[in-house]
From Swiss-Prot:
Coiled coil: none
Role summary: Acts with RNA polymerase to initiate transcription from intermediate gene promoters.
InterPro entries: Poxvirus_intermed-TF
Name of the protein: Intermediate transcription factor 3 large subunit
Keyword tags: Activator, Early protein, Phosphoprotein, Transcription, Transcription regulation
Keyword Flavoprotein annotated: no
Pfam families listed in its UniProt record: Pox_int_trans (PF05718)
Organism of origin: Vaccinia virus (strain Western Reserve)
Keyword Phosphoprotein: yes
Quaternary structure note: Heterodimerizes with protein A8 to form the virus intermediate transcription factor (VITF)-3.
Length: 382
């Protein structure tokens, strides 16, 4: 980890990170984080009864548990704004909301109606304006006019699916779905699977998302703010997430190990100089501290922050290159999966930029109208 941050610091005058995803590999010392969190979230409907430590409340926006039988969101109401009457309701036509109408539940309903949650994304994705049923086309070909075509409603206790078809082309379907959600206090509950993954998610107020899988491996999607400047800010954001995450685990799992790790993490946060932060991170790796010793890069992107004032020559890019140009002159390096990958493509990017500058200078010095076609091809296509 310290070597990655050291290199990112070396190039931060030219490149900035955008997407940054990584994993914390499960290890024996931490126990069954997934199972214990599942048990706590499943049995409670108040945020305070899950997250006891009030010091970390401002950092955590929501907890989500999703498996084949149940999806449950527990929200931290204090992290949401007070809505006015003109605040846009996003999801009324997708859901039937059942609530006990208490003040706490009514506030949760208000938040759910206005937040673009994963439940909204799921139900919008499964609603299909047009879908071709190829099995029914086959019936038409082989069965003639006596073929049976389905349209109508299919439903269970929590999901209603309406299938409509055109009388002239009955194999083309329009599918709409409505989902029932039960809102009690801070909890938003629906039955059945509402995601392709069985995970527990911790959504932070800074938009970072931590996904915990059944083996307690974690996938962390680190958010980025517009005011993030350089590697030191990135380290602070990552270790701020660590600090609050590990205190949450200590809260739920009652494992003193996480409190000890949170204290070590806090030393990185309170250090003011980058060199000191990197030194502490290196020491954590040497002592096999959770969060550093089991850190594994998932994928990250870099963007070239300087302006490209010369002509861009796309022909210099390999077909499978991770260097991409967006909107003509925006250079990004995408899907980097290791420090070695990063060093390799940054080096390629630097060399390519220099080659483009040279070609651009030559191109600007010649008369395009009189120059030979072969010479122009050599500049533009090779």
């Amino acid at each position: 980890m310290d070597n990655l941050f050291t290199f990112l610091h070396e190039i931060e005058d030219r490149y900035a990170r955008t997407i940054f995803n990584f994993h914390l590999i499960s290890c024996d010392e931490i126990g069954d984080i997934y199972g214990l969190m599942k048990e706590r979230i499943s049995s409670e409907d108040m945020f305070d009864n899950i997250v006891y430590n009030k010091d970390i409340h401002p950092a955590i926006k929501k907890l989500v548990y999703c498996d084949i039988q149940l999806t449950k969101h527990i929200i931290n109401q204090n992290t949401y704004p007070v809505f006015n009457d003109s605040s846009q309701v996003k999801c009324c036509h997708y859901f039937d909301i059942n609530s006990d109408n208490s003040n706490i539940s009514s506030r949760t309903v208000e938040i759910f109606e206005r937040e673009k949650s994963s439940l909204v994304s799921y139900i919008k994705t499964t609603n299909k304006k047009r879908k071709v049923n190829y099995g029914e086309i086959k019936k038409t070909v082989h069965g003639g006019t006596n073929a049976n075509y389905f349209s109508g409603k299919k439903s269970d206790e929590y999901l209603s699916t309406t299938v409509r078809s055109n009388i002239n082309q009955p194999w083309i379907k329009t599918i709409s779905k409505r989902m029932r959600v039960d809102i009690i206090n801070h909890s938003i509950v629906t039955r059945g699977k509402s995601s392709i993954l069985q995970t527990i998610e911790i959504i932070f107020t800074n938009r970072t998302c931590v996904k915990i899988f059944k083996d307690s491996t974690m996938h962390i999607i680190l958010s980025k703010d517009k005011d993030e400047k350089g590697c030191i800010h990135m380290i602070d954001k990552l270790f701020y997430v660590y600090y609050n995450l590990f205190l949450l685990f200590e809260d739920i799992i009652q494992n003193e190990y996480f409190k000890e790790v949170a204290n070590v993490v806090n030393h990185v946060l309170t250090a003011t100089a980058l060199d000191e932060k990197l030194f502490l991170i290196k020491k954590m790796a040497e002592h096999d501290v959770y969060g550093v010793s089991n850190f594994k890069i998932g994928m990250f992107n870099l963007t070239f922050i300087k302006s490209l004032d010369h002509t861009v020559f796309p022909s210099l890019l390999d077909e499978d290159s991770k260097i991409k140009f967006f909107k003509g002159k925006k250079l990004n390096i995408v899907a980097l999966r290791s420090l070695e990958d990063c060093i390799n493509y940054v080096t390629k990017s630097e060399n390519m930029i220099e080659m483009m500058k040279e070609r651009s200078t030559i191109l600007n010095s010649i008369d395009i109208e009189t120059e030979s076609v072969d010479r122009l091809k050599e500049l533009l296509l090779k």
